């Protein structure tokens, strides 16, 4: 175990998240946290002195900080939920690095890291999670497609405005100081992006919320991939479609380019 932390799960982070997303908050003491809402608990809270120029912690974090000349991206993951994680009770999260693999990509060397989290409460494992992290050279550029025409929103789609305030509040709720999400000058002048980057976890959470519209019970396997960067000016459109093998979810920008995809397989 590389990291372990225990805390009492208070209702306030969940209530703040519900306000941020304009979604209903369930009875947190009985129904427990909805799918992926555990991301707002048991957080790493580094000291200000331990942050680098980009806002990333530079030491004592899991996964490891990017290091000089490298950037870190959340590429996807899988969350297995065994039951409700309830507020008002203590919970423990144990984190390990499961694997590290170096590969050569089209834009340069890549390092793939798999981080595993296990969240327990009242002596039972409630959440098992795998996060896929990718490190790349800072000199390699992300592919940014032209926006193109705006497409209409279908009846089964959920449009979300990606505003600077939304990104800032999401960063605050997750104690994420990475400047690419709220500092437009830094995004443009240092990292060369055309706008503020939408958090990968925010896209995954939006897909989970769209799936919650079809099924409240968080139990099951949710697997997701982040396939393309999403910038604030491009907007976010979320969709969830029930099927015989589960609920298929996706995120696209307002121009039709898919940026994330996921599947919830209920138990």
What are the residue ranges of the model-derived segments?
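A contiguous, surface-exposed recognition patch within enzymatic or periplasmic domains that forms
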Residues: 1-32, 149-203, 210-213
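Hydrophobic, proline/glycine-rich low-complexity stretches
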Residues: 1-90
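HotDog/MaoC-like acyl-thioester-processing domains
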Residues: 2, 74-162, 226-233, 237-267
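Small/polar glycine-rich anion-binding or flexible loop at a beta-alpha turn
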Residues: 32-36, 204, 219-233
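Terminal targeting signals and extreme-terminal segments of soluble enzymes
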Residues: 54-66, 193-202, 206, 244-246, ...
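Short, basic/aromatic beta-hairpin or loop at an interaction surface
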Residues: 62-74, 195, 206-218
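Short conserved catalytic/interaction loops centered on acidic-Pro-aromatic/His motifs
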Residues: 104-106, 216-220
């Amino acid at each position: 175990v590389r990291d372990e932390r225990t805390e009492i799960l208070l209702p306030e982070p969940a209530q703040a998240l519900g306000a941020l997303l304009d979604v209903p908050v369930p009875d947190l003491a009985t129904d427990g946290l909805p799918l992926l809402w555990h991301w707002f608990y048991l957080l790493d809270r580094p000291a200000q002195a331990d942050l680098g120029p980009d806002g990333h912690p530079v030491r004592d974090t899991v996964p490891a900080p990017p290091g000089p000349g490298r950037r870190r991206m959340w590429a996807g993951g899988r969350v297995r939920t065994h039951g409700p994680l309830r507020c008002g009770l203590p919970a423990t999260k144990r984190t390990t690095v499961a694997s590290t693999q170096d590969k050569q990509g089209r834009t340069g060397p890549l390092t793939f890291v798999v981080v595993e989290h296990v969240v327990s409460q009242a002596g039972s494992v409630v959440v098992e999670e795998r996060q896929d992290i990718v490190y790349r050279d800072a000199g390699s550029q992300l592919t940014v497609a032209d926006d193109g025409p705006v497409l209409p929103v279908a009846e089964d789609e959920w449009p979300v405005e990606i505003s600077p305030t939304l990104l800032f509040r999401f960063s605050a709720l997750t104690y994420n100081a990475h400047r690419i999400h709220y500092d437009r000058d830094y995004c443009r002048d240092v990292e060369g992006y055309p706008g503020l980057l939408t958090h990968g976890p925010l896209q995954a959470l939006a897909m989970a919320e769209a799936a919650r519209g079809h099924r409240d019970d968080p139990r099951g396997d949710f697997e997701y991939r982040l396939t393309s960067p999403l910038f604030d000016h491009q907007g976010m459109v979320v969709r969830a479609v029930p099927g015989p093998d589960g609920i298929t979810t996706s995120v696209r920008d307002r121009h039709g380019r898919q940026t994330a995809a996921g599947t919830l397989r209920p138990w």
